[in-house]
């Protein structure tokens, strides 16, 4: 970059230099989304240049929240606009999400070929599908041909999944509370999930070859962090049976990064089960097993949705608080992940409802995370026994996610709710896909009549490329931002004292108009020093 006549102007910034110059760039998507969000001058230039010079690989794009899909669509559209290729990697890609991203890419590619390709050439996009069993490819000139090709591949994959050995079997368990008070709900919730954990441990343990103790590693997944902490305290207070010892690890995304990194390092070692007996040779596990006399040793990870993706962990069993079908599928993939063979007895317990419904039974329950909302998206029931069919909940795999039913019932089915919301967000309705009529001359009377007759246009992810000249302003990035976060955050730092032997917790205070930050010592009443 230093010798380039233009790019040498940004070579002084190490972050920009790394983003542009790296032959292979591995980064989170928030480094690239500014390419389409030019609200502040200059922030879009580096990711634009990166997309111009490389292809785009998106891992687990269906893991994004509904509110983030417009930004993801803008990024894929921009990749097509710049002539890049796009690879989507996930085992649970729903049809509407794929169709919406294809339509966005095709629209961008159309503009690219008009300016950089052969004049008048058809937009025939080479599309390919891969999984561990098969591969397929087809040139798709329009959305209809792409949808048909994708449907064929998804149906073949679903057929193979139906014949595969069943490594995860689920059973539905009731969840009830005698009060709406959060403290009592947390206490009863903890008692019930602990009972399920004991039952699953009894069925799915491994015998320690050195001591003969029965050992299992399980996961209790909860949807939200605040009730998770309350349940963790209730579990700690409740204790365990005299012949059992519970090793509890609380794992969520709001840990300080240093603590979260230490937790993940230990979990990565303990939950690598490719060699079933290797875990008993780990010093940390060995020390914990030898230190306790109880014959049953239960290792439990009480985790938030951060446990579902991103880590290659293998649990013996899991207890799941539901929030969406996608989360159930992703979490089920963490049970016996490294071990083959059929499972005869249930190793997953699905709670019939969740903590949020027990606390607020009149409102949406499967939301934040989840797809439920108010109005058209409010489920008529919040019990999995009515929201999921028997075949959908007994053997959990990707089939409900990769295929959709012709007639969706989003208020009666948790699976249909996800497909319907994705379809509304990603796929343009016929009116939104109509040709541009903005330049058709109209009389004032005709214009007024049309304005009264037309309903306000609904914003979707497709609005970016479907609405004429929408990209000329920053209105859509402002209305549909990527990962909008209104949480007030405080930056803390451990600063050494004058002796260099002790560290003091201080807050980084940045005043407007001041370049250098201030470091303000945190009051002793707000934190506790661990000896």
Residue ranges and their predicted role:
Residues 1-26, 41-43, 47-48, 52-55, ...:
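Conserved C-terminal RecA-like helicase domain
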Residues 30-33, 44-82:
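SF2 helicase catalytic motif II
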Residues 31-34, 63-66, 94, 308-309, ...:
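Residues immediately C-terminal
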Residues 61-64, 75-104, 333, 352:
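Conserved helicase ATPase motor motifs in RecA-like P-loop NTPase domains
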Residues 88, 98, 102, 107-228:
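Conserved interdomain linker/interface between the two RecA-like ATPase lobes of SF2 helicase motors
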Residues 185-213, 217, 223-241, 245, ...:
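The feature captures the C-terminal accessory region of ATP-dependent helicases
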Residues 285-291, 301-315, 333:
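SF2 helicase motor core recognition
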Residues 317, 324-348:
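Conserved SF2 helicase motif VI
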């Amino acid at each position: 970059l230093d010798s380039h006549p233009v790019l040498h102007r940004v070579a002084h910034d190490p972050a920009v230099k790394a983003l542009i110059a790296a032959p292979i760039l591995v980064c989170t998507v928030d480094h690239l989304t500014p390419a389409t969000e030019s609200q502040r001058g200059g922030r879009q230039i580096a990711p634009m240049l990166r997309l111009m010079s490389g292809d785009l690989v998106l891992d687990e794009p269906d893991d994004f929240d509904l509110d983030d899909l417009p930004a993801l669509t803008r990024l894929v559209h921009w990749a097509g606009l710049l002539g890049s290729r796009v690879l989507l990697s996930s085992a649970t890609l729903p049809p509407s999400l794929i169709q919406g991203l294809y339509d966005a890419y095709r629209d961008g590619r159309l503009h690219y070929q008009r300016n950089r390709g052969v004049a008048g050439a058809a937009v025939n996009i080479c599309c390919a599908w891969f999984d561990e069993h098969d591969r397929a490819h087809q040139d798709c000139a329009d959305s209809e041909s792409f949808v048909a090709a994708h449907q064929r591949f998804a149906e073949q994959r679903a057929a193979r999944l139906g014949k595969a050995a069943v490594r995860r079997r689920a059973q539905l368990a009731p969840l009830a509370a005698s009060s709406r008070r959060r403290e009592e709900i947390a206490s009863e919730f903890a008692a019930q999930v602990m009972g399920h954990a004991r039952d699953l441990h009894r069925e799915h343990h491994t015998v320690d070859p050195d001591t003969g103790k029965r050992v299992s590693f399980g996961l209790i997944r909860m949807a939200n962090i605040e009730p998770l902490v309350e349940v963790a305290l209730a579990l700690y207070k409740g204790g365990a049976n005299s012949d059992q010892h519970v090793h509890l690890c609380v794992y969520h995304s709001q840990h300080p990064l240093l603590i979260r990194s230490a937790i993940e390092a230990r979990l990565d070692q303990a939950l690598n089960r490719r060699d079933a007996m290797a875990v008993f040779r780990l010093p940390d596990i060995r020390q914990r097993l030898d230190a306790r006399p109880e014959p049953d040793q239960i290792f439990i990870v009480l985790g938030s949705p951060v446990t579902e993706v991103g880590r290659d962990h293998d649990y013996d069993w899991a207890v799941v608080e539901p929030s969406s079908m996608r989360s159930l599928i992703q979490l089920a993939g963490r049970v016996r992940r490294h071990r083959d063979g059929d499972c005869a007895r249930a190793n997953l317990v699905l709670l019939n409802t969740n903590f949020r419904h027990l606390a607020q039974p009149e409102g949406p329950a499967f939301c934040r995370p989840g797809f439920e909302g108010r109005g058209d998206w409010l489920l008529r029931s919040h019990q999995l026994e009515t929201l999921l069919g028997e075949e959908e909940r007994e053997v959990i795999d990707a089939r409900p996610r990769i295929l959709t039913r012709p007639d969706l019932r989003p208020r009666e089915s948790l699976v249909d709710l996800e497909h319907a919301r994705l379809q509304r967000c990603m796929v343009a309705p016929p009116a939104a896909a109509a040709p541009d009529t903005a330049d058709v001359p109209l009389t004032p009377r005709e214009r007024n009549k049309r304005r009264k007759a037309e309903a306000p246009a609904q914003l979707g992810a497709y609005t970016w490329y479907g609405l004429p000249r929408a990209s000329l302003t920053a209105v859509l990035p402002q209305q549909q931002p990527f990962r909008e976060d209104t949480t007030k955050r405080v930056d803390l730092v451990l600063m050494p004292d004058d002796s260099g032997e002790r560290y003091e917790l201080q807050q980084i205070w940045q005043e407007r108009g001041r370049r250098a930050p201030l470091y303000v010592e945190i009051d002793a009443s707000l934190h506790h020093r661990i000896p």
